[in-house]
Structure formats: structure tokens, C-alpha cells
Regions:
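Conserved SAM-binding loop of SAM-dependent methyltransferases across substrates and taxa
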Residues: 1-14
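Conserved SAM-binding motif I beta-strand of class I
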Residues: 17-25
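S-adenosyl-L-methionine
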Residues: 31-65
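Conserved beta-strand signature within the Rossmann-like core of class I S-adenosyl-L-methionine
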Residues: 74, 100-106, 130-138
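A mobile, often basic/glycine-rich helix-loop segment
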Residues: 77-110
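Helix-to-beta-strand junctions that scaffold the AdoMet/dcAdoMet cofactor pocket
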Residues: 89, 127-129
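Substrate-binding/catalytic lobe of Class I Rossmann-like enzymes that use SAM or dcSAM, i.e.
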Residues: 129-263
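Core SAM-dependent methyltransferase catalytic element
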Residues: 199, 288-311
Length: 311
């Protein structure tokens, strides 16, 4: 993707130097990032074709300001800012906010609103006048579809059912079940665009304006491939590890630290063994399909006194 961006810029401004800033949390593997950027892995790097691109990194939360004010021409974030600064509460009946109800669902919506405004407000401060922000996030479309639930199996309900069964079977405690919460909020389109369309909102007053918004469903490539090769074992071996890589940390965090490490890991192994059996029994309908909200915003002007939402 970035190679296409740089190629387009080079056609118009062949002699310009470009600065590319990566941002992630301090505990992220920046060493692996720059090994990839500098072509020290098996993947081709854009630097091999565009040596005038200068790369930098920032180890800060994107819920705060990362770059100097009015210094950014183009900002891009994908599949990231649905994560919250913290879970606002435990969910009594589910592991994810899509299954939360009543006050608990409202708490996640409110935390999602606050963190979204912090994210957009920080980017608004960084953008130059007429600078552009492109954000792609898991969301909820007009039909109620969301990541993990776009017409096949409901991925979050399956993991929740297994986790709840573990309580009934004495594998985990009720406290551990309630302590397992993904710090995420899937926003509707209305929730996504409110800060950049409401004249009373501080983000809107900072000059950030909505240019375009749409939702798209992106089908799981592993599930698509399975419809052709029909090899269940191959599908399981490709599909389950891709989920485990990012689901496991949150599930593990819910298990009491008073348990020995090997016991905690054994519970996680059992969770994914049962999930794997579910996939083997009924592979059709499984797949990690995305339902994403695509937003493009522009900073229309630079106010004399921009509000700092991350203060």
C-alpha cells in the first residue's frame, strides 16, 4: 500500500523527501518493525524503491498527541482505534461489548465516545491545514453486522459460550469469567462521525471535517479458500492460530494470577482445543470476516486556540 502512495507522490514531486512516522505502544516490538522497513526480512521493503523516505517511530498512545501541532500532511490508522484506554467495567454476561446489555453496554459506549474524541482530537492538532486523516475501524453497520458476526457463526458468542461452560465445569471461577473483557468498542457510523459533524463538539471546533464515510464487509481469505479446497484440517490449521494470536492475551488476563503459570496456559490450551473442535464439526460459516467503517477527514482550518482533548 505504502509503495503505491509513495509512487503517486513521486510522480508529482520527484525530488521531495518524505517523513514516515510509525506509532505504537512502548511495549511493541519496534526492532521487528524496523527490520521489516529496512528489508532485513523475507519481505520486500518500500525503501528499496523509495530511498528518499525517512522513517521514524514514536512509542506513545494514539489517544494522546504524538506529533507537533500542524506538522502532519496525512494520517492513517487501520484496525486499531476501536481499542479503549481501559475497559470501563466488567461485563457480567459476556466477554465482549457486543454481548453487553443495559448499563454495562452504555458504559462501553461512553468510554468509546471519550476515547474516540481523544483520538480524533489529537490527530486534528497534528494535521496541517487541508491535511487528511484516513481511519479504518471495526464497526457496526446498518444491518447490525460487526467483526466476527456478518452472517455466519457468531465468533464472540462461541468463545463466550465456551468460557461460560468452563465456569459450570469448574475450570475457571465466576470472578475469572467476569474479569475477561476485551477493551474494545465497535462504533456505529453515527458514533464514528458525530465528533466531526456536530458543531458543538470540540473535535469539530478544532477544524476536522468529514469528507467521506462508508461501511464494507471484508470476507476472511482463509474461509474463502476453504470453499474451494474443502480441506478441513488445512482450514483449521490456518484459521485457528490467526485468531489465537490476538484473542489469547485477553483471555489469559482474565485468569487469576494466583494460579500457577502452567495451569493458566493449560486453560487457554483447553479453550482453543474446544474452539477447534467446534470448527471441525461445522467449518462452514466459520471465518473471521471484517465489518469495517472507512472514514476520511480533512482539517479545514487551523483555529487560533485548538482545544487539547488529551489534557
Amino acid at each position: 500500500m505504502w509503495a503505491r502512495v509513495f509512487s503517486s507522490i513521486a510522480e508529482k514531486r520527484p525530488s521531495i523527501d518524505l517523513e514516515l512516522f510509525y506509532d505504537d505502544l512502548p511495549n511493541s516490538d519496534f526492532n521487528q518493525l524496523f527490520r521489516s522497513v529496512h528489508g532485513l526480512t523475507n519481505f520486500k521493503s518500500y525503501l528499496q524503491e523509495f530511498p528518499s523516505v525517512l522513517t521514524f517511530a514514536s512509542a506513545n498512545s494514539f489517544h494522546t498527541q504524538v506529533l507537533p501541532e500542524a506538522s502532519l500532511d496525512f494520517g492513517f490508522s487501520a484496525l486499531a482505534s476501536h481499542y479503549l484506554t481501559k475497559p470501563p467495567c466488567n461485563i457480567s454476561n459476556h466477554i465482549h461489548m457486543v454481548g453487553a446489555e443495559g448499563d454495562e453496554r452504555a458504559n462501553f459506549q461512553e468510554q468509546g465516545k471519550l476515547d474516540w474524541e481523544r483520538f480524533l482530537g489529537s490527530r486534528a492538532l497534528e494535521l496541517k491545514r487541508n491535511g487528511t486523516l484516513c481511519v479504518v475501524n471495526p464497526g457496526i453497520d446498518k444491518d447490525g453486522h460487526h467483526l466476527g458476526n456478518v452472517g455466519g457463526v457468531h465468533l464472540w458468542n462461541i468463545f463466550n459460550d465456551i468460557w461460560k461452560k468452563f465456569v459450570n465445569d469448574g475450570v475457571i471461577t465466576e470472578t475469572e469469567y467476569r474479569s475477561t473483557n476485551f477493551p474494545q468498542h465497535y462504533r456505529t457510523v453515527a458514533e464514528c462521525i458525530e465528533p466531526v459533524t456536530d458543531p458543538k463538539n470540540a473535535v469539530f471546533r478544532s477544524g476536522l471535517r468529514l469528507e467521506h464515510v462508508e461501511t464494507r464487509i471484508v470476507r476472511c481469505p482463509k474461509a474463502r479458500a476453504f470453499t474451494e479446497h474443502r480441506d478441513v484440517d488445512r482450514f483449521v490449521n490456518e484459521y485457528v492460530p490467526s485468531l489465537r494470536s490476538w484473542i489469547e492475551p485477553t483471555m489469559l488476563k482474565g485468569i487469576s494470577l494466583n494460579r500457577p503459570s502452567n495451569e493458566r496456559n493449560s486453560i487457554i490450551d483447553k479453550l482453543f482445543e474446544q474452539f477447534t473442535e467446534h470448527v471441525k464439526i461445522k467449518p462452514d460459516g466459520h471465518g473471521f470476516d471484517y465489518c469495517d467503517v472507512y472514514m476520511i477527514c480533512r482539517r479545514a482550518y487551523l483555529p487560533k486556540a485548538a482545544a487539547r482533548l488529551n489534557a
